[in-house]
UniProtKB/Swiss-Prot annotation:
Glycosylation positions in this chain: N88
Organism classification: Viruses, Varidnaviria, Bamfordvirae, Nucleocytoviricota, Pokkesviricetes
Region (Disordered): 114-142
Family label: Belongs to the asfivirus B169L family.
Entry GO terms, CC: host cell membrane; membrane; virion component
Compartment(s) of residence: Host membrane; Virion
Residue intervals passing through the bilayer: 28-48, 60-80
Membrane-protein topology: Multi-pass membrane protein
Name the record gives this protein: Transmembrane protein B169L
Keyword terms, alphabetized: Glycoprotein, Host membrane, Late protein, Membrane, Transmembrane, Transmembrane helix, Virion
Length: 164
C-alpha cells in the first residue's frame, strides 16, 4: 500500500474521533474500539445469520466476537499509533518527545555529572626529583616481592563443585 494513503486514512480516523464535542470520550482508544466492535457485530449479525441451534449459535457468536475484538485492537494500536508516529514525525522528534515526557524537565538543561574531584597531592606525598646519574646515600635496591601460591578462581567461588 502507498504510505501516503495509509497516513491519510489514519489522519482521517484521528480527525473523526477528536471532534470537539466528543473529544473527551473519543480520545480513549478502548472506548473507540468498543464502539467500533458493537457496530461491526450489529452489522455482522444483521447480514449473516449463524446456525439455528442455540448452543452452536452462542459458541459461534462468542468466537466471532473474540476475533473481531482482537482484530480491532490490533488495527487500532498497531496501525493507528505506530504508523502515525512513523509517518507524521521524524524519529528524532519521537525520541526527543519521549525523553521530554519521561523527565518532565521542559527546557532546562541538566549538566552532566562530573567525576569526584581528586584533591591536590601534598608536597611530602610527591616523589622527590633525583637528578639523573646521582644516587642518594640511603638508596637500597628493591627487594623481590614474595609471591604466594595462586588459588584457581573457580575453587574460590564454588569449591563444592570441584571437590566431588
Amino acid at each position: 500500500m502507498n504510505v501516503d494513503f495509509i497516513a491519510g486514512i489514519n489522519n482521517l480516523g484521528e480527525k473523526i474521533y477528536t471532534c470537539e464535542p466528543f473529544k473527551t470520550s473519543f480520545q480513549n482508544p478502548f472506548i473507540v474500539a468498543l464502539i467500533i466492535t458493537a457496530v461491526v457485530l450489529v452489522v455482522f449479525f444483521a447480514i449473516c445469520n449463524p446456525p439455528v441451534d442455540k448452543k452452536r449459535k452462542t459458541k459461534t457468536a462468542i468466537y466471532i466476537y473474540i476475533c473481531i475484538v482482537a482484530l480491532l485492537f490490533l488495527h487500532y494500536y498497531v496501525l493507528n499509533h505506530q504508523l502515525n508516529d512513523i509517518y507524521n514525525k521524524s524519529n528524532m522528534d519521537v525520541i526527543v518527545s519521549s525523553i521530554h515526557d519521561k523527565y518532565k524537565g521542559g527546557d532546562e538543561i541538566i549538566p552532566p555529572v562530573s567525576p569526584p574531584s581528586v584533591p591536590d597531592e601534598l608536597e611530602e606525598d610527591r616523589p622527590k626529583m633525583i637528578p639523573a646519574g646521582s644516587k642518594p646515600a640511603d638508596f637500597k635496591p628493591a627487594e623481590p616481592a614474595v609471591s604466594k601460591p595462586l588459588i584457581p578462581l573457580q575453587e574460590v567461588i564454588m569449591p563444592s563443585q570441584y571437590n566431588n
